[in-house]
Amino acid sequence: MELFWLEHKKLWRKKIVKIFVLLCFVYCVIFGSILSFQWFGFGSSDDYTSAFGNNFDGYTVIKDSQEYALSFGGELTDETLQKIVSDYQQMEADGMEEELEKTDWQIVNSWLGTLYPELRDTSNYKTMISYVDPDKLTGFYERRQQVLDEFLEVSGQVGAEKEFLHQIERKVEKPFHYEWVEGWSTLLGSMVADLGVVMALFLGIVLSSLFAGEWHDNTSTLVLTTRNGWGKIALAKILTGLAFTVELFALLAVSNVISQLFFMGTAGWDMPIQNIKLIAVAPMNMLQAEIYEYAFVLLGAIGFAGIVMFISAAVKNNVLTLLLSLAVVYGPMMIAEYLPYEMQKALDLIPLVGSSTDIFRTNTFRIFGKLIWSPYLLITIPVLIGILCMPFAIKSWSRRMKA
């Protein structure tokens, strides 16, 4: 334990580590959460050419939007949808531009495009919510089921796979609970979902020198001759890397949740994620989805840390270690679109390469003839990969120290 604390202190004493942790915090929390809520994400529009032209009044806009959504009764029915659309059109006709910003028009417009494509007027430059006849918006849940079936057919998900997904979807409670959706859509679609991709960069920078740095700092001889030996020190380094990963995640996650609670409160936590994407099959509400996404980031980060430490133990050069570590995450992302679909899904199992937003999709894996919904594997396989890399990191460190 003493060795762990020594390694832990040594890592945190490095000025470069403190600088990069601060940069990560500024990017993910200050810009990615606080300023996104207050300014360029939800601030009222002043300059429609750029989100950075928004006013610094996101808190007020969010609270007004939540209050407005509550006026529609809480349950999403045909009548609710008709009332939402009718109210929007009335405000637009009255020239109430500022009032329109507190509506869920982007979300509702996506519902209309998905469920009522025959009502789309291609000659009209306006969005559907501006011109569609509210009286024709009927059969919301029947149409949703039809669209889901058609999507599965087009995706080639038929037979046993289709029935498997339907079994999951049947657990979704209907009618949907409705409150303000846009905030949760942004939170789950980008704020939390993109956290892992950013963490990968900073974890790669900090952890790449954990083992390789001993040669760079000319301390390898000292490590070799210490009474503790390479084995205990290697274990202490791995525990230090894991601790740093969890600490960085906790710093970002706790700060983001505090920011979220300040701006959004807990309103809408029990809405189904189908309010964001109608054809999602997961029986999850917004809070459950957020917990899943944070678990995805944490477990993926631990898995990635294991890979980085293995590379650091196997490679003496800090820069090469960093490049190889970053290539593990960003390489597959760059080439994925050029690969067959099944290979893309396989690459998603690499730590932090996949996306927590798979809970909105219908992806599955077939393993030993058994169908498994992709989100289950996306939070288990990456961390297992990282854990498996750790013993190899110790062995690799051993060979190099003995050499």
Residue ranges and their predicted role:
Residues 5-7, 11, 310-314, 381-403:
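Junction motif at the cytosolic side of a transmembrane helix
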Residues 21-25, 319-332, 350-351:
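Central hydrophobic cores of alpha-helical transmembrane segments
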Residues 18, 231, 318-320:
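Residues that define the loop-to-transmembrane-helix transition and helix capping
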Residues 217-221:
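Hydrophobic transmembrane alpha-helix segments characteristic of membrane transport
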Residues 1-20:
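Aromatic- and glycine-rich beta-strand/loop motifs that create alpha-glucan
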